[in-house]
Design a protein with these regions (language model features):
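Generic structural motif
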Residues: 3-5, 90-91, 147, 184
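N-terminal mature ectodomain segment of secretory-pathway/periplasmic proteins
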Residues: 1-54
Length: 191
């Protein structure tokens, strides 16, 4: 499948068009605006490997750069790679409701000192198994990022993302310091 959409900065209104494809367990995010860039997540490796393709070639995005913003938005490479989904020893923290839906709250802790997050709490829909929202914490257990699925769509019986809100949080006072939306159009089958 192929989906088009955009990342949009809430403060400036600036948007970055994107194309998202998934084929052979490789997810590709294509950004056409200058400088053009492709970020692809190869889920054939364990853990999944994040690559960046720019003029001059392709390279693995090093762990030390996972906290860098993608296209100047509040969405970073760690968010894009969803690397925290592969962290070992998830812990069930309880249950909650998100948009009226029952969810489990699952906490994962970063097994290394690399990356922007120390721990991540995920609200997982009990019905679909999909993530409804996420809160990420720094090494002092202060919230630094949260995102929430604000719209979903059905594709051949499966629930897929339509809109995601990503917020960066000031760990000192909990205030939102930046907000980006990822919006995706209806998927189209690859030829």
């Amino acid at each position: 499948y192929k989906m088009t959409g955009e990342l949009r900065d809430d403060t400036s209104g600036r948007s970055e068009p994107l194309t998202l494809t998934m084929q052979n367990r490789v997810m590709r995010f294509l950004f056409k605006n200058a400088p053009p860039e492709i970020v692809h997540l190869d889920m054939n490796t364990s853990p999944a490997t994040l690559y960046q393709v720019r003029a001059g070639g392709s390279s693995v995005v090093p762990d030390s750069q996972h906290g860098n913003k993608v296209r100047g938005m509040e969405f970073n490479y760690e968010d894009l790679s969803l690397a925290f989904l592969y962290w070992p020893r998830p812990q069930l923290m309880g249950e909650d409701r998100v948009s009226g839906q029952k969810c489990w709250i699952v906490r994962v802790t970063n097994p290394s000192s690399q990356g922007p997050y120390y721990a991540v709490d995920l609200w997982v829909h009990q019905g679909s198994g999909g993530a409804a929202k996420m809160a990420a914490f720094d090494r002092t257990s202060k919230i630094v990022k949260r995102y929430q699925v604000t719209k979903v769509q059905k594709v051949e019986g499966a629930t897929t993302l339509k809109e995601l809100r990503i917020e960066s949080i000031n760990p000192a006072n909990g205030a939102v310091i930046g907000r980006t939306y990822m919006k995706l159009d209806d998927p189209v089958k690859n030829n």
